């Protein structure tokens, strides 16, 4: 009887540990690291938005604050 209780306890502990690890990535904790990896892996260094838009973004400082502009104005923001 004691062996069965111990086995159930160990299995529950393993389940809790696995669930806790998985939950950390779902909350977006690693979002910034993933974005940096994506920026580094892209081959083409182009601006997807019009040149005027990207220049305004750089002047306004949105290259540092906005992921949207950081990805779509890579060349103007100096990320590649």
UniProtKB/Swiss-Prot annotation:
Region: Crucial for binding to potassium channels, residue numbers: 68-69
Residues in ShKT domain copies: 45-80
Domain of life: Eukaryota
Record Pfam families: ShK
Residues of the signal peptide: 1-20
Entry's Gene Ontology cellular component terms: extracellular region; nematocyst
SUPFAM superfamilies assigned: Crisp domain-like
Residue ranges annotated as propeptide in the record: 21-39
Disulfide topology: 45-80, 54-73, 63-77
Keywords: Disulfide bond, Ion channel impairing toxin, Nematocyst, Neurotoxin, Potassium channel impairing toxin, Secreted, Signal, Toxin, Voltage-gated potassium channel impairing toxin
Gene Ontology MF annotations: potassium channel regulator activity; toxin activity
Annotated localization: Secreted; Nematocyst
Role according to the record: Inhibits voltage-gated potassium channels (Kv1/KCNA).
Family: Belongs to the sea anemone type 1 potassium channel toxin family. Type 1b subfamily.
The protein, known as: U-actitoxin-Avd9a
